[in-house]
Curated annotation (Swiss-Prot):
Residues holding Mg(2+) 2: 112, 268
Family, similarity comment: Belongs to the FGAMS family.
Domain of life: Bacteria
Annotated binding of Mg(2+) 1, by residue: 88, 534
Reaction catalysed by this enzyme: N(2)-formyl-N(1)-(5-phospho-beta-D-ribosyl)glycinamide + L-glutamine + ATP + H2O = 2-formamido-N(1)-(5-O-phospho-beta-D-ribosyl)acetamidine + L-glutamate + ADP + phosphate + H(+)
InterPro entries hit by this protein: PRibForGlyAmidine_synth_PurL, PurL_linker, PurM-like_C_dom, PurM-like_C_sf, PurM-like_N, PurM-like_N_sf
Subcellular location as annotated: Cytoplasm
Protein name, UniProt field: Phosphoribosylformylglycinamidine synthase subunit PurL
């Protein structure tokens, strides 16, 4: 093949890779085969840099039905029902083309869930943007990205009819060159009706269903495995274009198919399209496959085998059906006005054979491309900045009056209400959503089949992960679990989306290795196994990587959907308690960031026993009918958590407690919660706290038209204006 070096460079392959490919094939590869190896060995598909670190994740528990390795994780939720869930990134496409990038991220994660046999019932998203407050082009571009991404998520999810019920939105200048768009979906099915991505049974037909294949998304998997430069805008053709109405038809057709016994295996065509779906299905089953690419439904004229194998056109699935049922399968999809064609069959050769009008155009062994793809052991190095980052503390910065600090923190885009975002999403479609977004610490969906509730929350504080990559990742697991527990549910399992910079940088690889250690440690200690997840590397532009951002989505179960705990003030004269101990801990805090522009200090102490005691306390207090409301104490500390409860409940607060150093109301000590109770239940609450071994301290009472805590005194009207209106004012100021 001529110009081999240029071809390899275009496919992000090295000469070493090329020699390896020749050894596997026993000959020189052709262009189609190079395209296949390039996509399947990309970071995006093969996890070659990260796989060695993921192997130690705890993945088993009595309630885990399916752990990592399939399209999504599955847990038992009782009464013969299962919850299916996963989180994925669509970072690179969303930065290049925000609307379609975010929309197709939603589409892809929905397919991961319904390909397992589950009807999707809830979506979350975790979004990270750059500095939208800047007055220059960078700030304007970030505001454009926010508007585009949110519109894309809403546009797709709303049309498919799956509620988007929560998530998180945060901002930091480290995301100016790479935004992060992490999408989560959860579905429900019967636990004995789960489908897997396997192609087995010699002679069984391989069927293509869904949209026609076009040239959109060509090279998307390879693009997502590289860092950005100034040339990035030229990559728009590598971003897929979504059609949510077709997705809805595909969803319903698949669910109808699952009621039959025709299916051997099914796989969504995601990154690397037909290549990944076919190789993954054959790889999991240890089988081979013959595919006739001229049978693939095409949207454009003149498409080549190379393009058909690597296109990332959306809303497509690959099905392995039982021999003899193919016409019935085709009939179901055509009834839903979808393309459906038999394009191949399963073999026992362990080889993928591709044909084009009768001519063989590729012949590749399955295992070396999929299950046995190369793994890298990249060098790691502790970042130099960690040597001096702990020198900063609350005692090394100037004193700021509590009132001034409170107003600044309350107006932080990390804190203020995100109604502008979630009001663009249909959160109530399907009528299973227990409460509106923003009114609970977790997002909660009712399981109509058994009267239970599934709670879910996504969390990560990138500042914590920057100052302590291991502890910050563990803290994300704790925080996601804490949110779930605050709603009254028992945390059960996580899915993750591990967003990091360039793995070719040893310091980034060290951050990643430490992050996975933190997740392993926390999940073991808290008994919340990892059941699915995603790794997104190369989140870097012009040599600048994002902060380590291991987003954790925790899923939990509440046995009674009528016992879900809100997170805002309910009734005047109720008493508010702080549960847990407060220390003077400001490492990575919002206080240091907003008031002094510093991301530094020592991470608050991690104590898994305290965390578990807090979860047990809140869950038991709720079961005993003691709680009116519960709120996790997170960024901004007690002051900000109380302010959110007051604003959302439209009730003031009169504090009658303060710390010796009043700044501790902004401390971010872990494993704490605020609870609101009826005064008559004070004794019962304190008895339960003693029983569990956790401190419960009364802070004050609900009511009035002012917010008063230590030296803070603010009219509720002003507090509500800052909390509810700041986000919209900031994001829409260009319009």
């Amino acid at each position: 093949m001529e110009n081999i070096e240029e071809i390899l460079k275009a496919h992000k392959l090295t000469m070493e890779d090329y020699e390896h490919i020749k050894k596997i094939l026993g000959r020189e590869p052709n262009l189609v085969e190079i395209g296949i190896f390039s996509a399947m060995w990309s970071e995006h598909c093969s996890y070659k840099s990260s796989k060695k670190y993921l192997k130690g994740f705890p993945t088993e528990a009595p309630w885990v039905i399916q752990g990592p390795g399939e399209n999504a994780g599955v847990i038992d939720i009782g009464d013969g029902m299962a919850a299916v869930f996963k989180m994925e990134s669509h970072n690179h496409p969303s930065f290049i083309e925000p609307y379609q990038g975010a929309a197709t991220g939603v589409g892809g994660i929905l397919r991961d869930v319904f390909t397992m046999g589950a009807r999707p019932v809830a979506n979350l998203n975790a979004l990270r943007f750059g500095d939208v407050k800047r007055e220059d082009e960078v700030g304007a571009h970030q505001r454009y990205l926010v508007r585009g991404v949110v519109a894309g998520i809403g546009g797709y999810g709303n049309c498919v009819g799956v509620p988007t019920i929560g998530g998180e939105v945060s901002f930091d200048e480290c995301y100016n060159g790479n935004i992060l768009v992490n999408a989560f979906s959860l579905g429900i099915c019967k636990k004995d009706e789960i489908f897997y991505g396997r192609a087995e049974g010699v002679g069984n037909p391989v069927i293509y269903v869904g949209s026609k294949t076009g040239r959109d998304g060509l090279g998307g998997a390879v693009m997502s495995s590289d860092s950005f430069t100034e040339e990035t805008k030229k990559l728009r053709p590598t971003v897929q274009v979504g059609d949510p109405f077709t997705e809805k038809l595909l969803l319903e057709a698949c669910l109808e198919l699952f009621k039959t016994d025709y299916v051997v295996g099914i796989q969504d065509m995601g990154a690397a399209g037909l290549t990944s779906s076919s190789f993954e299905m054959a790889g999991r089953a240890g089988s081979g496959m013959k595919m006739y690419l001229d049978k693939v439904p095409m949207r454009e004229e003149g498409m080549t085998p190379y393009e058909l194998m690597l296109s990332e056109s959306q809303e497509r699935m690959l099905i392995c059906a039982k021999k003899g049922t193919e016409e019935k399968v085709l009939e179901i999809f055509r009834k839903w006005d979808l393309d459906a064609e038999i394009i191949g069959e399963v073999t026992d050769t362990g080889v993928m054979e591709l044909y084009w009008h009768g001519e063989k155009v590729a012949e590749v062994p399955v295992a070396p491309v999929s299950e046995e793809a190369p793994e890298l052991d990249r060098p790691t190095k502790r970042p130099e900045y960690l040597a001096y980052i702990k020198e900063t503390s609350i005692d090394t910065v100037p004193h700021v009056e509590d009132q001034e600090a409170f107003e600044k923190l309350l107006g932080s885009l990390e804190v203020v209400n995100k109604a502008w975002v979630y009001e663009q999403y249909d959160s109530m479609v399907q009528t299973n959503t227990v409460k509106h977004p923003g009114t609970l610490d977790a997002s909660v969906i009712r399981v109509k089949e058994n009267g239970k509730a599934i709670a879910m929350s996504s969390k990560c504080n990138p500042r914590y992960c920057y100052i302590d990559p291991k502890g910050g990742a563990a803290a994300a697991v704790m925080a996601a679990g804490r949110n779930v527990a605050m709603s009254g549910a028992r945390p059960l399992a996580i899915t993750d989306c591990l967003n990091y910079g360039n793995p070719e940088n040893p310091e980034v690889m060290w951050q990643f290795a430490q992050g996975t250690e933190g997740i392993k440690e926390a999940c073991r200690a808290l008994n919340t196994p990892v059941v699915s997840g995603n790794v997104s590397l190369y989140n870097e532009t012009n040599g600048v990587s994002v902060y380590p951002t291991p987003t954790i989505a925790m899923v939990g179960l509440n046995d009674d959907a009528n016992k879900v705990v809100p997170s805002y003030f309910q009734e005047t004269n109720d008493v508010v308690y702080i549960i847990g101990d407060t220390e003077k801990e400001f490492g990575g805090s919002l206080y240091l960031k907003e008031l002094f522009g510093k991301v530094a200090g020592e991470l608050p102490k991690i104590d898994y026993e305290k965390e578990l005691r807090l979860w047990n306390f809140v869950i038991e207090a709720n079961n005993r009918g003691l709680l009116k409301a519960a709120k996790d104490v997170g960024v901004g500390g007690i002051a900000i958590a109380l302010a959110k409860m007051a604003a959302l409940g439209n009730k003031g607060f009169l504090g009658n407690f303060c710390f010796e150093d009043s700044r501790e109301i902004f401390s971010e000590t872990f494993s704490r919660a605020l609870v609101e109770i009826d005064p008559k239940n004070m004794h019962a609450l304190e008895e339960l706290a003693n029983e569990i071994g956790i401190h419960a301290t009364p802070l004050g009472t609900v009511g009035g038209n002012r917010f008063q805590l230590c030296d803070i005194d603010m009219e509720m009207e002003k507090l509500k204006d800052i909390y509810f209106n700041t986000f919209k004012r900031e994001i829409e100021r260009d319009l």
